[in-house]
């Protein structure tokens, strides 16, 4: 069974209830056969190990390149330290295929083989940009992948491994321009709790704007952003106080009184 159909304990940090390909808590990736006490996320039964053939990306060939690239890239220190930790422990060739059932793109010419989602997902950056160029005549002639173009990614800390190791290696392998920098941020929590539909802490942006001005939320998030990967907590009591004191209060204080108006 592909990784997302398996759950268990992370073999790296011991976090429970993690998927079979990566850990949300420590960010590590691993083979689904490495996860501790695995169960099927569909049936809850214990999976049986069977042999199957896969395609691999020879990531080990890029180990020296990745070390040098990280050294010369101004990635946040906490992320860079974690990436170097992964590199120093020895990276393995990357399994880029999954067997059916899977939700990725089917590999042409193969029987029930799919590209692993983190192999094809970053390619979407290239495909989306190419599509944008096709419908916008003003930028159609620009080569966005030459060495003079700067490329920046803004991502969540849970996908740093894929964007800071796999993605640069892919770009290097096809001789495309590398990211100028990658900025990672933490998760968004609600009143100190992880977003969850079952716990009623999941908020859609479309629902939020029905009650509040989106500019208030942008300001609140901007006031909490930093160069770290700490989670940002949307605490509604703090949100109310901050908006009232910083924005609404300031507006009222600086507004002219009736006698001052012309």
Name each region found by the language model.
Residues 31, 103-104, 262:
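Short amphipathic alpha-helical segments with coiled-coil-like heptad repeat character
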Residues 256-262:
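A short, hydrophobic C-terminal helix/tail in secreted or cell-surface proteins
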